[in-house]
Amino acid sequence: MNKFDEFIESNEKDLDVDTSTRNSIISMSPVRKTGRKIRSASSNGYRLEHHRTSSAGSMHSQRLMTPTRLNDQDHPLQAKPDARRVVTRHSSVSVPNAMSKRRSLIQPMVVPTTPESQNNLPSVSHSEGSYGIPLESTTVLSSEQAMASGLRRSRNGSSQSVNSMIATTIPTNGVDVSALLQSLATKELELLECKQKIEDLKKQTQHEEQNYTRRARELHELKEQVSKHLDPSLNTPVKNRAFSPVYQNIPLESRTENAGNSSLPSSVSKPKNMGHQSTNQSRSVSPQDIQERRQRDDSSDSSKQSLWSKPLALFNQFDKIIQHEIERTLNWDDSLSGTPEVQEGTPTSNSESSAQQYDNEAPGARQKSPSQGSVSRSLWSFVSDVKAGLLGIEEENDNDVITDNRCDPVYKSDRQHEQKKSTHKITNRGQAEDSGDDSSLNMRKFKTTTKFQKDNAGNNSLTDESGHRTREKKSKRSSNKLSFIGEPDNDNSSVQKLS
């Protein structure tokens, strides 16, 4: 016995506590203070421990995990006033073995199974397997199997310990409730984990959708930037683009509804703007698309013609006036200078009368500079015709019928006969516009109230003498003459100013 064991025994004596292991003492009974310390092995109160010898020859004690008697009074650590500490120790037990014996007091107490219960374990596992409970999920059964395998090698010959262990075995005639509850809790935890995973996946899906939307928007913005760099025409404002994709899909009839009611300046400026914008648009359109667009424009119906009827009529009027003045100055001035003419209400007759007046009043100026005189007369007649035409647009429809019977055919020359034919064509211009036919559009015939009154006076003067008719004619020519601010009254000064 070493000093460590002596120290422990002395402390146990002072404290009156027994700290020996249960493998050396099975049960204790009150012992009176007598001279004996150790009773014989044949006594009823104690059962000696069983030892087995290993292959190395060292002695190992087989420890029992549970007491044979389940009574609080027989507990070895319970202090009793009349109890005496009894320690049975084998002389061959080493110090580390004694330390392990003392540490075994804090180990958990597990109830072992009997050999009879071991025979019923396969049936229990089969019944548990039928309910879908694996044996690995139960810690109680695994610990029981481990202890049972260790107890098979032990030599328990005491009938008292066997009876006590049979009484404390777990009933195996049914399913273990604790195992069912444990499996139920496990399944609930698994369901909660699955639900949490589903929620996490949903959140991740929403986050990915937001990222996808943001990246798609960024891609669209990059495409717009690249298109602006490649095509400078896209940088122009939207109001300057005529052939936008949305505008191309609109039918031509709906586009021309409001265009027909627009004012004259907007109608005149619209073709210029559209031509300018179409050149910008053609930069980003292939030649095939341009050809197809031209074919569609050529094959459009009469609604397109009615759209441009009024601007074309105005252009036609200016063209006829300019053409007439050019022809008159180049070819007809010399041939018609000496022929008497009758004043008519058309712009061409006004130009003729003014030209004849200039020829009669200033022959010296025209002989000195014939080219300058012809140009001045042309400009003068053109300005007079435009002024008379703008003032007589509203009275056009009321005075067209009276114009045809205004003059006598006796005083008409060949040139006047041709002008009468052109006037008859212009009279039917309203019907040509309604039918959509532009072939009959000709120079418009303008007429004012003063002209109408003077024409009536001229028709009445045809029956008078030639001198009286000449005087009326001269007064008409002077009335149709365009006067400027600060201009003298005499005709000679006006002719000199124009020349």
Curated annotation (Swiss-Prot):
Modification Phosphothreonine, positions: T236
Keywords from the UniProt entry: Coiled coil, Cytoplasm, Phosphoprotein
Organism: Saccharomyces cerevisiae (strain Zymaflore VL3)
Compositionally skewed regions (Basic residues) per UniProt: 470-479
Compartments where located: Cytoplasm
Similarity comment: family membership: Belongs to the TDA11 family.
GO CC, alphabetical: cytoplasm
Pfam families: TDA11
Coiled coil: 179-231
Name this protein carries in UniProt: Topoisomerase I damage affected protein 11
Superkingdom of source: Eukaryota
First-listed, main subcellular location of the protein, grouped into a coarse class: cytoplasm
Region (Disordered): 32-62, 252-306, 332-377, 400-499
